[in-house]
């Protein structure tokens, strides 16, 4: 409403300025000149021949232009001959000069209503009602700013252009000083009603009462001047009002557009709120699912791991999961701080926030379908420990931390649809590993039985073959078992992708290390039994060697020497390395075969060896007791 209240006085101000401006100023003058030149070019062939018989070849002026202008002005048609044209040209030439900005200020003011009749009387004192009618029309247009019809305005424009062309055609006619003196007051009296007191006496003094020739040009010139002023003012006012109506329409359109924009902004803000709330709800749901999954995984991992080496890595991963949750919690807060006008940005942010967990869920579903074996490893280990299998007796190796910690970070997202499939896979995996554990037990019992049998045979028949069996029975058999176990694992578990291959490799390494630990325990036990038996044998041999030196041969001596070498080899062994143990045993066997028989036949040398063997056996027994 405020804009409309301001536009109405602005329209009147612009209309007043347009009326007061010079008629031939700016682009309008250029357009009038172009139109006039075009009409001259088109009508020059017809009018140039002097149709009225004038000697100069100029139109006489009694054309339809002047008659139509008089008819539009409301006056009677004056069919006076040639005397109407010469003042016509002078009046058209004088009119732009006299219509300056000083006189325009007077015309745009508030003229008295009595001035217009005075001007009509001063013009009608020479003869006519045409001047009075024209002056009244001009006074009405100046006072009331009446808006004429568009059709009438177009007709007046045509009339004014025709009059201007005729004026240009008659511009070459000489002007008399009398006509100039009589026209300038008339034109002034027609334009500025306020100057009637000064103009009317001058016009009366210059008139000759008896001459009709001066009256008719004067009256005609005033009629034409008034019609020109009326047509021009009507054109200007019609143009101004057209512009005003167009500006009103534009303002209405802009108001409607602003209202529509405000409505769309409101709708966008509501949509932004809805999307942000949906994004928050979805993010909170995903966070709760992630927290539940991470808690369940963390509990399973804590039950599986007995060492302190695994806990820092799990704590770090749990911290990383918590940091992810906090960053996802911060995203909606940042979106809330954004301006509501930026609807596209808020929508894009909310879409990205919603799309991220969906993509991760899809990726996790693919990973679970392709590599379901990875997720069931730690749970199978936990079930084996609960059922009391020999896996619980094994010592945890350095690969346990990697194996147990690896699936925790990968399987934060679990889709509820795959839970049944995972349970079936877990049960199948448990059955497979139980079968493997039973096979390992049977193999280990067979190994222990074979080792005991070999020890008994070595005691009953002490020869080189039995010594080789004692020295080598522990080493190659676990290698064969490992190869068989590896083939079984390779047959049972075919890797589907790189993750499955790595998990299988970790399982194999773990099984190998568990077997090595079991083998070391069995070998330590066997060595202790051997040490006790060797002590008895050494004492018995020492007592028998004094009485029966001749009965001893190379093989019992080699047996005692191998005992010394084996005990020395055991002193150099470390319980964490199997290769050094095997190499020590092999070296003892080689050294036993390389001892010359003549050295062992000497009694002094044999006594020294038996004493050294007894001392070494005592040292080895104390060392093994300390280690156990």
From Swiss-Prot:
Compositionally biased residues, Basic and acidic residues: 246-266, 276-285, 311-343
UniProt tissue specificity: Specifically expressed in otolith matrix-producing cells.
Region Disordered: start-end pairs: 43-628
Protein location: Secreted, Extracellular space, Extracellular matrix
Keywords from the named record: Extracellular matrix, Glycoprotein, Secreted, Signal
Biased composition (Low complexity): 78-93, 613-628
Carbohydrate attachment residues: 318
Disulphides: none
Main location: secreted
Signal peptide residues on this chain, from the entry's feature table: 1-20
UniProt feature, compositional bias: Acidic residues: 449-462, 477-489, 514-536, 544-556, 565-578
Polar residues compositional bias, start-end: 182-214
Listed GO CC annotations: extracellular region
Domain notes: The Asp/Glu-rich (acidic) region mediates binding to calcium.
Function statement: Calcium-binding component of otoliths, a calcium carbonate structure of the inner ear involved in hearing and balance sensing. Binds calcium.
Protein name: Otolith matrix protein OMM-64
């Amino acid at each position: 409403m405020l804009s409309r209240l301001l536009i109405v006085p602005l329209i009147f101000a612009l209309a007043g300025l347009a009326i007061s401006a010079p008629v031939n100023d700016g682009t309008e003058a250029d357009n009038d000149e172009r139109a006039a030149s075009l009409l001259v070019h088109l009508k020059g062939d017809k009018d140039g021949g002097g149709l009225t018989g004038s000697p100069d070849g100029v139109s006489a002026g009694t054309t339809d232009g002047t008659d139509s202008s008089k008819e539009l002005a409301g006056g009677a048609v004056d069919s006076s001959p040639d005397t109407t044209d010469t003042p016509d040209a002078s009046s058209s030439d004088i009119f732009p000069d006299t219509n300056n900005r000083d006189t325009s200020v007077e015309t745009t003011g508030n003229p008295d209503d009595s001035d217009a009749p005075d001007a009509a009387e001063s013009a009608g004192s020479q003869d006519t009602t045409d001047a009075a009618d024209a002056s009244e029309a001009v006074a009405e247009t100046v006072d009331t700013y009446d808006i004429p019809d568009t059709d009438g305005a177009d007709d007046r424009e045509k009339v004014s252009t025709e009059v201007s062309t005729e004026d240009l055609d008659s511009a070459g006619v000489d002007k008399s000083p009398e006509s100039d003196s009589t026209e300038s007051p008339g034109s002034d009296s027609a334009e500025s009603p306020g100057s009637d007191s000064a103009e009317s006496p001058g016009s009366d003094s210059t008139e000759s009462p008896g001459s009709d020739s001066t009256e008719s040009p004067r009256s005609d010139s005033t009629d034409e001047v008034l019609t020109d002023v009326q047509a021009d003012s009507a054109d200007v006012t019609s143009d101004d009002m057209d512009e005003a109506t167009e500006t009103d329409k534009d303002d209405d359109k802009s108001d409607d557009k602003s209202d529509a924009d405000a409505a769309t902004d409101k709708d966008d803000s509501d949509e932004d709120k809805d999307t942000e709330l949906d994004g928050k709800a979805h993010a909170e749901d995903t966070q709760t699912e992630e927290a539940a999954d991470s808690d369940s995984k963390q509990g399973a991992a804590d039950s599986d791991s007995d060492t302190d080496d695994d806990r820092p890595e799990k704590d770090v991963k749990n911290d990383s999961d918590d940091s992810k949750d906090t960053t996802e919690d911060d995203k909606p807060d940042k979106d809330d701080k954004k301006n509501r006008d930026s609807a596209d940005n808020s929508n894009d942010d909310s879409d990205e926030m919603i799309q991220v967990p969906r993509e991760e869920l899809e990726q996790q579903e693919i990973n679970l379908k392709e590599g379901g074996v990875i997720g069931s490893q730690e749970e199978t280990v936990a079930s084996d420990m609960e059922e009391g299998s020999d896996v619980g007796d094994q010592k945890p190796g350095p690969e346990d931390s990697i194996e147990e910690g690896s699936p925790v970070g990968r399987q934060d997202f679990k889709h509820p649809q795959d839970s049944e499939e995972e349970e079936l896979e877990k049960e199948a995996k448990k059955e497979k590993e139980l079968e493997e554990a039973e096979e390992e037990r049977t193999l280990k019992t067979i190994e222990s039985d074979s080792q005991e049998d070999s020890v008994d045979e070595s005691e009953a028949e002490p020869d080189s073959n039995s010594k080789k069996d004692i020295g080598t029975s522990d080493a190659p058999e676990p290698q064969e078992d490992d190869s068989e176990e590896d083939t079984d694992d390779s047959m049972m578990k075919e890797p589907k992708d790189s993750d499955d291959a790595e998990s299988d490799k970790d399982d194999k390494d773990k099984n190998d290390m568990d077997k090595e630990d079991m083998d070391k325990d069995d070998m330590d036990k066997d060595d202790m039994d051997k040490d006790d038996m060797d002590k008895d044998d050494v004492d018995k041999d020492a007592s028998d060697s004094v009485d029966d030196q001749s009965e001893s041969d190379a093989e019992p001596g080699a047996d005692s020497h191998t005992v010394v070498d084996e005990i020395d080899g055991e002193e150099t062994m470390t319980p964490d390395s199997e290769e050094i143990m095997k190499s020590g045993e092999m070296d003892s066997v080689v050294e036993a075969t390389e001892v010359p028989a003549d050295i062992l036949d000497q009694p002094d040398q044999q006594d020294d060896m038996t004493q050294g063997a007894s001392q070494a056996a005592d040292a080895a027994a104390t060392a093994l007791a300390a280690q156990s």
